Amino acid sequence: MSGLKEKLVARALEEGFIACRICRPDAVPDVAARLKAFVDAGYHGQMTWMADRMHWRGDPTQLWPQARSVIMLAESYGPEHDPMAVLQQPERGAISVYAQGRDYHDVVKKRLKRLARWLMAEAADADPQVKVFVDTAPVPEKALGQAAGLGWQGKHTNLLSREWGNWAFLGAVFTTLDIAPDAAEVDHCGSCRACLDVCPTDAFPAPYKLDARRCISYLTIEHKGPVPTDLRPLLGNRIYGCDDCLAVCPWNKFATAARDMRLSARPELTAPRLADLAALDDAAFRALFSGSAVKRIGRNRFVRNVLYAIGNSGEASLRQIASELTDDPDDAVADAARWAVAQLGG
């Protein structure tokens, strides 16, 4: 298998990944303790699956004991527009950059599978086995990414790189092949606090620590039912996710736009009108977000978010739209509608 690693990296870049590095499955011994502290503090909120699968997420060797190497890959989704600009348009909704294109789970996983098939053929004499993962299994991708040398976990807890900033999806290929690991990356955040200071909800109790219960991405995507009243005004017009801590990172001066056009933003999702989104029924919601990660939260949670944004808009013209949803069959939607009407002076 002489030269396999070099061929693998070259093939990964040909497939469209922006970086490919290797680590051992046991290269993240501190993850279990950090995850336990996160869960013990209650920072995971309603994400009970984080606690339920902690034994796997905290120790990748438990996920697949036969694995000898983890191939970590990064795929760019850098925006071609300023993701913060829409925050100054209160009558429009802000959707996280990663969800403005096609669902990355589908795009990246297909690419990982192609790379895995190539690896199995290239190293056929060793009869390798492979498993691919993209954010849907209990894999500590960010920690493995740092161990493999892709980048480091910044103060906002996301992975970032001096080569491509922090606009990247991560994917992993576990394999029974023994491939020489790369050196781990070290922290390059220095004294910078940009990501911590920009957070609208003060979701970072300390650098490198996130309280998901206050994170807008968690509140608009993972949180079921009504959002706590004191946090609603802080959502602004963010209706699916939040990019503030990512967008202000100075290392993004090296970021590149998405190479795969499927991950590029759909124009109709960069700054959609709140009035149009509030009117979506289930069928219209599924049609608009077909192939998008947004579809995963369903119409009710999405319209709930839209109504919070309407309430924060200061636009009296949107009051009637909110009032029409005060009797919505979904309790969280109806509650959000009543709150929006009250915020707009109704």
UniProtKB/Swiss-Prot annotation:
The pathway entry for this protein reads as: tRNA modification; tRNA-queuosine biosynthesis
Q: Which InterPro entries match?
A: 4Fe4S_Fe-S-bd, 4Fe4S_Fe_S_CS, QueG, QueG_DUF1730
Q: Which PROSITE patterns match?
A: 4FE4S_FER_1 (PS00198), 4FE4S_FER_2 (PS51379)
Q: What class of enzyme is it?
A: oxidoreductase
Please give the HAMAP family that the UniProt record associates with this protein. QueG
Which residues does the record give as [4Fe-4S] cluster 2 binding sites?
Answer: 199, 215, 242, 245
Segments forming domain 4Fe-4S ferredoxin-type: 179-209
- Function (record text): Catalyzes the conversion of epoxyqueuosine (oQ) to queuosine (Q), which is a hypermodified base found in the wobble positions of tRNA(Asp), tRNA(Asn), tRNA(His) and tRNA(Tyr).
Q: How cofactor binds (record note)?
A: Binds 2 [4Fe-4S] clusters per monomer.
Which Pfam families does the entry link to? Fer4_16 (PF13484), QueG_DUF1730 (PF08331)
What is the protein's name according to its record?
Epoxyqueuosine reductase
| Source organism of the structure | Roseobacter litoralis (strain ATCC 49566 / DSM 6996 / JCM 21268 / NBRC 15278 / OCh 149)
Where do the catalytic residues lie? 135
Similarity annotation: Belongs to the QueG family.
Which residues take part in binding [4Fe-4S] cluster 1?
A: 189, 192, 195, 249
Source domain of life is Bacteria
What chemistry does it catalyse, as a reaction equation? Answer: epoxyqueuosine(34) in tRNA + AH2 = queuosine(34) in tRNA + A + H2O
Q: What is its main location?
A: cytoplasm
Q: What is its EC number?
A: 1.17.99.6
UniProt gene name: queG
- Gene Ontology, cellular component aspect: cytoplasm
